[in-house]
């Protein structure tokens, strides 16, 4: 009797499910008759080409992947909001900073830089920290890293640098012989290499790392006055990194630790927060620095910061592919009141990042919800694959796809014009003057605790000891010696490089 009652309950449950279940369909909306068996010519006959459901499933499966990002391939996204902490309209007319308490929705994508999508998140690497602000002036992307500087200062070296850091085209393995061969002729990398080989190169979580805009940008107010700014996200959770032994332990237990931690904490209601700070310099003050303030390999030392707002991440994406994977960030996505500086690396990124997103996602990438502005879009960009918008907004005539027109009145916003900038000099192709490649690496080294110094030497010598070319190894050690004699001496000992050779190279 008990079994009969159970059977009856199960039968009723199945009947209930079948009544309320949604019908499986093909992409054209037609219902599917059988999703377990292909159509065949008899029990043991061939599968028929007319099985359009089977064909469509296989076709769609073969086309699920889009091109992987050439850098920043492995990423984790989250939604949130930015709240400005004051009225900074005296510095910029950009809307996120113009009214105290204003709330701007954001989407953030954290990432590793060099390694591929399936790589462990424990690997040493800078970490991407890209923030998309959905403002009422359009989307603004602040595309930065967890470290304040970069390896190179000119975008013409970017493809070479990435090639050297990526796996070998022969073995498909990342090889210190390759990237130190490249860096041995790039003394500008000394500062960034010091940063990335500290424990900051292996963060304990995305929540416990800072973010930096790296480059100088321009803020312009309504009077047309220009100031240079650098952006800094400060984690309210504090900065925590993994020491060498911890990296090995964590990788063996969970090589997705950064993503797991972020999503677990957000889903538990422990929303991570970052305060946004800016350093501000007038053009005159920038010109008086004893190093090039537009050099992406430098931080602005001894320039005070001011807090301008707080970001809170409070929602995990509903679908990884639709949001995180298809999110497209580019420094060229700017709004009135913010302009790029003359930083040579930034100038190249303005083109390269936008172009790689067009390659990955197509010309209509801004129609994807995660990239779509919250503000109205009205222009005459048209057609292309997967277009589902006229792009014209609430205009009177869809027949007019040009401007100017007497039939449709599209206006421009004069405050969005490029700020007038004086130019002088001659067209040239030369390195910057006064590069000062080594001194900030020394400042960083001397600021570290003894434990952090020891970990830096351990981390850096571990990769340098894999280099087969003795000259490359000696040159690299000489760069760090020029940054700080103690730094170079300890590194020479850890790598069995002759200190006399190092000092000779350092004096050249």
UniProtKB/Swiss-Prot annotation:
Entry EC number(s): 1.11.1.6
Main location: periplasm
GO cellular component terms listed in the entry, alphabetical order: cytoplasm; periplasmic space
Cofactor: heme
GO biological-process terms attached to the record: hydrogen peroxide catabolic process; response to hydrogen peroxide
Positions with biased composition (Polar residues): 373-392
Ranges where the record places region Disordered: 373-396
Keywords of the record: Heme, Hydrogen peroxide, Iron, Metal-binding, Oxidoreductase, Periplasm, Peroxidase, Signal
Active site: 72, 145
Signal sequence region: 1-21
Catalyzed reactions: 2 H2O2 = O2 + 2 H2O
Disulfide bridges in this chain: none
Pfam annotation, one family: Catalase
A molecular function (GO) term: catalase activity
Cell location: Periplasm
Annotated binding of heme, by residue: 353
InterPro entries in the record: Catalase, Catalase_AS, Catalase_clade1/3, Catalase_core, Catalase_haem_BS, Catalase_immune_responsive, Catalase_sf
Sequence similarity: Belongs to the catalase family.
Its job: Decomposes hydrogen peroxide into water and oxygen; serves to protect cells from the toxic effects of hydrogen peroxide.
Database matches in PANTHER family: CATALASE (PTHR11465), CATALASE-2 (PTHR11465:SF23)
Name of the protein in question: Catalase
Species assigned in the record: Vibrio vulnificus (strain CMCP6)
